[in-house]
Amino acid sequence: MLKQQTIDTIKATVPALQAHGLTITKTFYTNLFNENPSLLNIFNQTNQTKGRQQGALANTVLAAAMHIDNLEAIVPVVVKIAHKHRSLGVLPEHYEIVGANLLKAIKEVLGDAATDEIIEAWGEAYGVIADIFISVEEDLYKASEAAGGWRLFKQFKIVRKVAESDLITSIYMAPVDGEPLPIATAGQYVTVRATVPGKEYLMNRQYTITQS
């Protein structure tokens, strides 16, 4: 539970986030990857290049600030993001790294306007929000392990490719260990993580499951 003073301080930063949120998140990602290049194995590099990830994070941070006194209001957003995090293998230990770099970016962009009180308040708020994400994601990880499922990634092999049209190709895959797979439900997708020739880091792409 956040103190009222912390809530008031966070809400007071909303105008600054509205004005500088995108700059903060761009700075955040630059610092994050410079200091932790291994995280490039997790994040979608195409979304980074096109600025989608920076914009999405800026909107999320702003929403958290605006609803810091009623975080239940952002639970639907948290759940949506948590599903994506689970699909990419985001772990609890990543949140400490992200938090440190987010606070650093806020200070770097806002300068003297980011007082010690503001940085401390955002540190406390981030801790609460991170705990919510970690809890939701752990539930998702546990659910993914049920009925033939697995946590994180599993090796598959391509057994068949079918060109359905000029734009669509169906890829049929089977687990390397030969174990049976859980039955997929409508709307589910799978993250394919693979090495790509000429690329230094792993590439992640989400694909819709059409048959299980």
Where do the language-model regions lie?
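Ferredoxin-reductase
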Residues: 147-212
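Globin-like tetrapyrrole-binding proteins
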Residues: 1-153
